[in-house]
């Protein structure tokens, strides 16, 4: 090939002639004499010797034709250049062109290889990605959630329940799984969606019905909970419990193999679930790592698509299962299969978790089946597993079903009994092996010590009660096979009611063993069990083993849950579960009474101190009882003697707590009257300090823009007055809360006792959650901590009231320990006005906080406590304040008039009721000019779920007894409704 210049043009005369004529003209110059050709060169020296242009076109073509040496095609005539040079030039030209073509081909091939590599990498990434993140088909994963409606029919009427289909979780052979949110309750499920197009065959429909029937009948802590199912025109929806930590298969992919203690932790829970299924005559037939879901680090067995219920004498012959986990008798199919196929699968799971891969796994399914039939597997050198682990795997993977151990024998094996099983595993173990310190902290005791199966001659308590007598009889008949030990363990099904009778018959023999179990499993509850409350008719002594009495004293709700106890297979689990239900029935009462144990001890100490000081106080009490105010002196009559005592000396004694010691705790609900009777110097016009046992609001925060008012009382209670007029109050570091919900047309406050650690109905649970947030807000505040912890040191403000936590009971039940008689003090109503905010407590105490940061507390009809911003606290009679400072007198008059009428009005309670403005100024008599307030602490930030409290100067301040001063919590001089 030759390269032709783009500007090359043929002569016009040549272009217009046919090709044959042009060829003839090309040959004619070769036949002309040499002389003529030489004459042509004389005229045009620039042309080569073998080219003779036409005379007619020479002038015109010379400017349009550009010929290079590489373009010229020479005829076979003699030339001046040697022939080898011409060939070399042509070869070089051809080589250049060939080299260019090769480069282009190489570039194209490289591009193709890069594209193929990218495609392979994308495919590998998609295969390695977990199911929730893998998106095999974008068309099946819409960006916006799909709305699904369920039609609910009630008689002739019907309504639609709305669900929102969310994230794709995974898929199986016939269904896909998505997140599904119920719009009405905002509850999230894992929805298994089966298209109706796959249910056209009768066999497919019957399998789905069987799965729904079996799964909906199950209830076990290690089985995925069946919630609900419905259908529409396109799909069938099965709503299941959502497990938040994927499956054991995901752990296997990330970690390959687990430690033995981790394997025991998971396999033990799998056995519990399978034992429950077998006792209900159900075979799972698809046990594998992908069907072992994890929720809060607990195993949940799922996917009952291949499960079947076995009737009396029936052996299934359907070939089904996952190739790596399928049992040899399913492949043989001559004699059918039964419960032993699940035992085989447990052995495969055990091997896979310890070794890192299934024992019979190959690249070809047929070869895998052949190895299963021939029982060809081995243990690799690494990872190293114990002799106990190998021994258990070998015994389970026995090709003869009848020679495999049953579930009870598996748990009795040395693999489970020679070393402890962890109580729980950390979440980090999903991706990495737990540290040794974490292992040591979470280790329990060996299974043999927990169950006493080995040490107590195998007590044969491993089974559970079957649903029906016929099914239970069949399950026992199935176990009557050649291996007698295998039969006996399965035949001994456990029924708690029968077991109670057996326990009573053998009570003398097993008394010590039962005591050991109770002691081992209830060490954390010894403090609770040392009480014996006659009202509950239950003895909590550790030596009590009368299970009949324990069962009889269970609440109806706990007796309904007895089936859950029947589904456990070990003696210690039954006793512990039964004991736990007892404790749950009485936990609220125990916690309430335990709150006041320390309080009662402190009361006894106070009484002893009072007895010691009684002799010293007798004379002073006689002085107070016979006091007669005469100007600046007090005349006291004792027999025939008259003693004149200066008021200043008496005030000094009172201020130094020589007289005003804490009185015994009252059992009367009328707090102000009891205070008046118990206070030694109440017959005086006034005294310095707070009244004993007075409960007042020490701090509060405003959340009324969404929720309500939160507050802290001086007795360490935290409460809330919600915008819907419901109230709740709880003691700091307590699990008990008192919820007041007034019912229309009824008397009383509708009080309920709640356990904040348990779940409640939606509306009540919202209030419990809020009080937890309020409690956290106050307890994390430095100011609040000072307010709460001053009881032991401040005699003039709290008087050790922290120990006297609402020890008020009904007069008619003074000696009763029933928790219903304990009446916590709480905010009954509150209103704001221009100069401050007023509260009415449930004990009829009225407290008013003013903008000038002073407080007035009316604890009874005649006793008033004035707390200035700076200065000494004064408690006196109403007459004393009426005859004193006019500004204070005007405030008290306003409290007894307008505020009292509004706080005690029978109209619907309104927290935003405005009152007329009361004009006044800060009384100068109680101001202290020399001292300044403490620096302001930073306001505690709340969680994002709650709004920040609006700041107000009416918030209470910490009083320091040795320094006549308050510590501000919020200094702003403008009140915002709190």
Swiss-Prot record:
The protein's name is Probable serine/threonine-protein kinase PLK
Its keywords, alphabetically, are:
ATP-binding, Coiled coil, Kinase, Nucleotide-binding, Repeat, Serine/threonine-protein kinase, Transferase
Q: List, from the UniProt record, the residues annotated as the active site of this protein.
A: 286 (proton acceptor)
In short, the EC number is 2.7.11.1
SUPFAM superfamilies, A to Z: Polo-box domain, Protein kinase-like (PK-like)
Source organism per UniProt = Dictyostelium discoideum (Social amoeba)
Where would one find coiled-coil regions in this protein?
497-555, 592-630
Q: Segment Disordered: which positions?
A: 19-66, 121-143, 463-554, 601-638, 798-819, 908-978
């Amino acid at each position: 090939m030759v390269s032709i210049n783009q500007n090359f043009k043929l002569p016009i005369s040549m272009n217009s002639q046919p090709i044959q004529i042009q060829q003839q003209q090309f040959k004619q110059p070769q036949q002309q004499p040499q002389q003529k050709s030489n004459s042509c060169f004389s005229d045009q020296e620039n042309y080569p010797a073998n080219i003779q242009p036409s005379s007619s076109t020479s002038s015109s073509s010379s400017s349009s034709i550009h010929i290079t040496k590489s373009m010229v095609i020479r005829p076979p005539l003699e030339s001046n250049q040697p022939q080898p040079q011409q060939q070399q030039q042509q070869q070089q030209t051809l080589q250049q062109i060939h080299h260019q073509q090769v480069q282009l081909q190489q570039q194209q091939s490289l591009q193709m290889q890069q594209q193929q590599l990218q495609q392979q990498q994308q495919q590998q990434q998609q295969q390695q990605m977990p199911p929730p993140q893998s998106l095999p088909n974008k068309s099946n994963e819409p960006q916006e959630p799909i709305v699904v409606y369920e039609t609910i029919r009630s008689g002739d009427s019907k309504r639609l329940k709305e669900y929102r289909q969310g994230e794709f979780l995974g898929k199986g052979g016939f269904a896909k799984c998505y997140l599904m949110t119920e719009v009405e309750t905002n509850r999230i499920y894992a929805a298994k969606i089966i298209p109706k197009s796959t249910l056209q065959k009768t066999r497919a429909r019957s399998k789905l019905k069987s799965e729904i029937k079996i799964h909906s009948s199950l209830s076990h802590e290690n089985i995925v909970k069946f919630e609900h199912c419905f259908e529409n025109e396109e799909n069938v929806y099965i709503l299941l419990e959502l497990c938040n930590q994927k499956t054991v298969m995901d752990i296997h992919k990330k970690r390959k193999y687990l430690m033995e203690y981790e394997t025991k932790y998971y396999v033990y829970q799998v056995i519990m679930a399978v034992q429950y299924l077998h006792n209900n005559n159900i075979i799972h037939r698809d046990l594998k790592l992908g069907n072992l879901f994890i929720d809060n680090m607990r195993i949940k067995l799922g996917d009952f698509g291949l499960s079947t219920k076995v009737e009396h004498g029936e052996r299934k012959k359907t070939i089904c299962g996952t190739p790596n986990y399928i049992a040899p008798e399913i492949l043989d199919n001559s004699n059918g299969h039964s419960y032993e196929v699940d035992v085989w699968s447990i052995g495969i799971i055990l091997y896979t978790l310890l070794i890192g891969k299934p024992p019979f796994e190959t690249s070809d399914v047929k070869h895998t089946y052949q190895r299963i039939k021939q029982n060809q597997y081995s243990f690799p050198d690494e990872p190293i597993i114990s002799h106990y682990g190998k021994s258990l795997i070998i015994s389970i993977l026995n090709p003869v079903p009848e020679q495999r151990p049953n579930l009870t024998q598996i748990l009795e094996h040395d693999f489970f009994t020679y070393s402890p099983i962890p109580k729980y595993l950390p979440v980090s173990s999903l991706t990495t092996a737990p540290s040794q310190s974490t292992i040591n902290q979470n280790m329990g005791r060996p299974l043999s010590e927990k169950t006493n199966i080995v040490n107590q001659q195998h007590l044969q308590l491993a089974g559970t009660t079957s649903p029906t007598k016929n099914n239970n009889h069949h399950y026992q008949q199935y176990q009557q096979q050649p291996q007698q030990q295998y039969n006996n363990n399965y035949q001994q099904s456990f029924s708690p009611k029968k077991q109670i009778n057996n326990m009573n018959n053998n009570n003398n023999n097993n008394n010590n063993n039962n005591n050991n179990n109770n002691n081992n499993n209830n060490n954390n509850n010894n403090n609770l069990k040392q009480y014996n409350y006659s009202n509950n008719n239950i003895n909590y002594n550790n030596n009590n083993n009368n299970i009949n009495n324990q069962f009889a004293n269970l609440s109806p709700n706990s007796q309904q849950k007895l089936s859950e106890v029947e589904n456990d297979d070990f003696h210690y689990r039954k006793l512990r579960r039964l004991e736990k239900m007892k404790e749950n029935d009485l936990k609220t009462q125990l916690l309430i009474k335990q709150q006041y144990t320390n309080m009662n001890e402190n009361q006894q100490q106070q009484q002893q101190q009072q007895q010691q000081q009684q002799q010293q106080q007798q004379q002073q009490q006689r002085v107070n009882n016979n006091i007669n105010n005469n100007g600046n002196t007090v005349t006291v009559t004792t027999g025939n003697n008259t003693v004149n005592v200066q008021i200043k000396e008496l005030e000094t004694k009172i201020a130094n707590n020589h007289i005003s010691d804490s009185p015994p705790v009252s059992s009367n609900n009328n707090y102000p009257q009891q205070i008046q009777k118990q206070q030694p110097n109440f017959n005086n016009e006034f005294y310095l300090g707070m009244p004993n046992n007075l409960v007042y609001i020490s701090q509060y925060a405003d959340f009324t823009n969404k929720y309500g008012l939160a507050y802290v009382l001086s007795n360490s209670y935290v409460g809330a007055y919600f915008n819907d007029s419901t109230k709740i109050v709880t003691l700091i570091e307590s699990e008990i809360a008192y919820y007041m919900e007034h019912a229309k047309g009824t008397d009383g406050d509708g009080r309920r006792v709640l356990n904040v650690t348990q779940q409640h109905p939606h509306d009540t649970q919202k209030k419990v959650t809020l009080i937890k947030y309020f409690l956290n807000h106050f307890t994390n505040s430095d100011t609040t901590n000072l307010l709460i912890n001053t009881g032991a040191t401040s005699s003039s403000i709290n008087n050790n009231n922290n120990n006297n936590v609402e020890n008020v009971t009904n007069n008619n039940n003074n000696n009763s320990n029933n928790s219903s008689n304990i009446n916590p003090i709480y905010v009954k109503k509150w209103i704001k006005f221009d100069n401050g905010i007023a509260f009415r407590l449930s004990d009829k105490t009225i407290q008013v906080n003013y903008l000038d940061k002073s407080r007035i507390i009316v604890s009874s009809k005649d006793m008033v406590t004035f707390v200035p911003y700076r200065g000494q606290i004064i408690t006196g009679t109403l007459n004393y304040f009426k005859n004193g400072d006019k500004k204070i007198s005007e405030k008290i008059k306003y409290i007894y008039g307008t505020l009292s009428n509004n706080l005690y009005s029978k109209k619907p309670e309104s927290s935003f009721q405005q009152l007329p403005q009361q004009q006044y100024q800060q009384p100068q008599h109680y101001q202290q000019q020399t001292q300044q307030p403490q620096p302001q602490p930073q306001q505690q930030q709340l969680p994002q779920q709650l709004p920040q409290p609006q700041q107000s100067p009416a918030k209470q301040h910490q009083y320091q007894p040795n320094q006549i001063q308050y510590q501000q919590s919020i200094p702003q001089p403008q009140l915002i409704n709190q």
